[in-house]
Amino acid sequence: FSVLLFDLDNRLLIQQRADEKITFPSIWANSCCSHPLYQNGEEEGIEGAKKAAVRKMTQELGIQDGLIQSNDLNFITKMHYRARADKKWIEHEVDYIFAIKVDVDINPNTNEIQKTRYVNQKELNNLFDKANSDDVRIGPWFRLIKDNFLNKIWRNLESLQSIKDNKIHQMGEIK
């Protein structure tokens, strides 16, 4: 799953993954991303992915337990992709994309995240532009989200339910 957390000023929380991460260390990514576990109903489709997202937002972003509930997350869509992290690891998943607009205090887990920041659309575009020329690396799934869904999400932050679809968008293998 991928969570896009926007504050009340419509800025998106992004994170730079910790250097110690096994897959995609040090890359910039969306607010929170991970995978459901085979526990407590997390394997059960959209609702299971929402439960996993809430668990990871508490664990990874340090959001106070119970502050965000699974029904606060707006399901947007799903995308299927493959992305090689290195010679050993590859992501191959159906990524459930969720969005939420809320002001929350965060206390990032340094084992998971080295930096966070809130960005507006222009600032995010500048970061992506730097990724093409500088030493800035962007998560491949985050690039897919930005290129295919994020503008529509940003335009509809006040009516997120109006843009959800039940498709699985086939993205293929990405670099």
Q: Which residue ranges define each predicted feature?
A:
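Conserved active-site beta-strand-loop modules that form the wall/rim of enzyme catalytic pockets
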Residues: N10-L12, L73, Y96
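A short coil-to-beta-strand element that immediately follows conserved catalytic motifs
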Residues: D65-T77
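Short, well-ordered strand-loop elements centered on a beta-strand within folded domains, enriched
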Residues: N10-Q16, D105-T110
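Secondary-structure boundary elements
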Residues: F6, G62-L67, D105-N109
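Well-ordered beta-strand positions
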Residues: L4-F6, R117
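A generic structural motif
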Residues: D7-D9, N125
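Nudix hydrolase/Nudix homology domain
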Residues: C32, F75-K175
